């Protein structure tokens, strides 16, 4: 399966039991910042934004004082899982980032999608990729 198919079929799909509700943007990005696949709506990000995200995975709490920036949008960092998941909030939406062995799985959402639904979609694919050694 292509990386684009993972984004299209597993991240940008309807959320179980909520037809028509889906993430607003998603991507799979290598630890080096190279985009493996992304939705058409995923923001253009700067290398320093990706560096900050990777630093937070290695040094949990790094982004808490400044916020998480992606594509020029600032998210307030909320409770995640140290070294595994970063979660951010902005207004009625937010972001979930799951780290796998080789990649970062991104999901961005707006209401009516809930933070929990975004977490479920992103983390389920991330856990699958980890099981596959990716």
Swiss-Prot record:
It is found in: Cytoplasm, Cytoskeleton. The keyword Transcription regulation does not apply. Its main location: cytoplasm. This is Profilin-2. The keyword Phosphoprotein applies. InterPro entries: PFN (IPR048278), PFN_euk (IPR005455), PFN_sf (IPR036140), Profilin_CS (IPR027310). Keywords: Actin-binding, Allergen, Cytoplasm, Cytoskeleton, Disulfide bond, Phosphoprotein. GO terms for cellular component: cell cortex; cytoskeleton. The modification Phosphothreonine is found at residue 114. Occurs in many kinds of cells as a complex with monomeric actin in a 1:1 ratio. Belongs to the profilin family.
